[in-house]
Amino acid sequence: MSDIIKDTKSRMQKSIDNLSRELANISAGRANSNLLNGVTVDYYGAPTPVQQLASINVPEARLLVISPYDKSSVADIEKAIIAANLGVNPTSDGEVIRISVPALTEERRKELVKEVKKIGEDAKVSIRNIRRDINDQLKKDEKNGDITEDDLRSQTDDVQKATDNSIKEIDQLVADKEKDIMSV
């Protein structure tokens, strides 16, 4: 397998991994520590992820418990969660922060499904852009005499197969997440 095809698959896999991370951050009405993935706290002047400042537990299906290692950071963590606009209200007793994840309404579920589809579509566009870039590079290589016309055709077919597989994987990830969101 040529380096170009390996590069193509590697770049496409990165797009799929990015999609997986984005989908993991979308709450399906159940408490999940991934909900706090993008939340950073201003801790002694440095933006720090919540995961580095506290242990995060999920004792019940709709409850997140955040136990800061440094009790003086409770208020800062709480402010950061509120500022992150996650659609949840943290409550604190001075030692731990509890986040009760509300049940999703039918309307909110539909909004989330739309968001998931949009994120999936963006990932597909990313995959297609990778395909276009690689195909342009292959045509340039053929024009410069670096590869033969047969190699061009063969590698273009390989790029298309990689694209098709990646799009199929994206569709599956999106369908699984939609099913997860719509299940009550």
UniProtKB/Swiss-Prot annotation:
One of its GO terms (biological process) is translational termination. Belongs to the RRF family. Responsible for the release of ribosomes from messenger RNA at the termination of protein biosynthesis. May increase the efficiency of translation by recycling ribosomes from one round of translation to another. InterPro entries: Ribosome_recyc_fac, Ribosome_recyc_fac_dom, RRF_sf. Pfam families: RRF. This is Ribosome-recycling factor. Gene3D superfamilies: 3.30.1360.40, Ribosome-recycling factor (1.10.132.20). The gene is frr.
